[in-house]
Amino acid sequence: MTSPANPSEVTRDRRNRGVAFVCAGVFVAMVGMSFAAVPLYRLFCQVTGYGGTTQRVEQYSDTILDRTINVRFDANTSGVPWEFKPKQREITLRIGETTEIAYVARNNAPTTTTGTATYNVAPALAGAYFNKIECFCFTKQSLEPGQTYEMPVQFFVDPEIVNVPELKNLKTITLSYTFYPNNQESAEGPAEGAAKTQKLGG
């Protein structure tokens, strides 16, 4: 005959099972949060301009200032067999004025390749005031073998930038893009450790 279980052992077994269930639940929650972290971080960056992330808008500025600012354009690739460059390296425009420029990409691979562009602005604080209306970076881009494709960007610099003490004397903004293979997790948000660039001032 089997002797009855010791009450203390039963209690300990129940406690151990409870701890195991809690640990398993925490693990599942952490895995779920890790998958959600990237899109949530991107959304945060796009809303606040964190780390030089530019803003996406649907309408033009209704205010155009007499003051001008220079915008430089930078292009990079990482892991895609493309030539990628801006048609113009630098332009001068009035603050609040909507302008369209273009980048050009050429696929040097013997197969069709697809890329996704990440983007940021320097100085990082200016990202919250750099507003894009149209951009190739909003969607993935596919190029056939040897295809050359011109990709427009339509943007303006928010007039509110002149009310920010750290930016009121800013002369030049640099807009930078990097194309990654579409099957990689691209970082539309900033690099780790980038400075916060939430809009300041009135």
UniProtKB/Swiss-Prot annotation:
Function description: Exerts its effect at some terminal stage of cytochrome c oxidase synthesis, probably by being involved in the insertion of the copper B into subunit I.
Residue spans, topological domain Periplasmic: 38-202
Location(s) in or outside the cell: Cell inner membrane
Biological process annotations from GO: respiratory chain complex IV assembly
Major localisation: membrane
A GO CC term assigned to this protein in UniProt: plasma membrane
NCBIfam families attached to this UniProt entry: PRK05089.1
A GO term for molecular function: copper ion binding
Annotated InterPro entries: CtaG/Cox11_dom_sf (IPR023471), Cyt_c_oxidase_assmbl_CtaG (IPR007533)
Transmembrane segments: 15-37
Alphabetized UniProt keyword annotations: Cell inner membrane, Cell membrane, Copper, Membrane, Signal-anchor, Transmembrane, Transmembrane helix
Protein family according to the UniProt entry: Belongs to the COX11/CtaG family.
UniProt topology in membrane: Single-pass type II membrane protein
The protein's name in its UniProt record: Cytochrome c oxidase assembly protein CtaG
Chain ranges on the Cytoplasmic side, renumbered to this chain: 1-14
Record keyword Membrane present: yes
